Amino acid sequence: MDDKKTWSTVTLRTFNQLVTSSLIGYSKKMDSMNHKMEGNAGHDHSDMHMGDGDDTCSMNMLFSWSYKNTCVVFEWWHIKTLPGLILSCLAIFGLAYLYEYLKYCVHKRQLSQRVLLPNRSLTKINQADKVSNSILYGLQVGFSFMLMLVFMTYNGWLMLAVVCGAIWGNYSWCTSYSPEIDDSSLACH
């Protein structure tokens, strides 16, 4: 019974230390893992390599202009250097621009598919067009969610790249939207 109580105490202390260090940010890495158990043989884990923290993705919960160790949506898209930041911003700018182009293509396609039925204001769309419209809609929603996730890095440079790409894309592909076309979507952007 003593072993269970001691193990529980050590586990709770370790959990408390992890929560405290991650929430308050006092420690970026653990210098040692030397946990002495009272009344039992100690376990010394100080020889374990925990990494130096240089290659870990940071997750900002507040707005930041820092770019080092920022991961963009995927673990493999890891910004470590200034050139990496610049290339990432250009890629994100391009993605936001392409999103606006996709919106333009969807709108243009919807306008071209409109065939008025006699004496009605309804439109008739064939099955193949419904399938392709649904696929394009899915791409549009997926694209917008990816851009939302980029924005949720809270990195000022990446957020600026999304906004600038959207501005330039809207300027390049802006159309006068027809009120008859339903523009409601799940798009986050």
Curated annotation (Swiss-Prot):
Gene Ontology molecular function: any one: copper ion transmembrane transporter activity
Transmembrane regions: 82-102, 143-163
Top-level taxon of the source organism: Eukaryota
Membrane-protein topology: Multi-pass membrane protein
Topological domains annotated Vacuolar: 103-142
Cross-referenced InterPro entries: Cop_transporter
A Pfam family annotated for this UniProt entry: Ctr
Residue ranges, Cytoplasmic side: 1-81, 164-189
Entry GO CC: endoplasmic reticulum; fungal-type vacuole membrane
Localization in the cell: Vacuole membrane
Any GO BP annotation: intracellular copper ion homeostasis
Family note: Belongs to the copper transporter (Ctr) (TC 1.A.56) family. SLC31A subfamily.
Function of the protein: Provides bioavailable copper via mobilization of vacuolar copper stores and export to the cytoplasm.
Subunit note: Homomultimer.
Name of the protein this chain belongs to: Copper transport protein CTR2
Native source species: Saccharomyces cerevisiae (strain ATCC 204508 / S288c)
Species classification: Eukaryota, Fungi, Dikarya, Ascomycota, Saccharomycotina
Gene this protein is translated from: CTR2
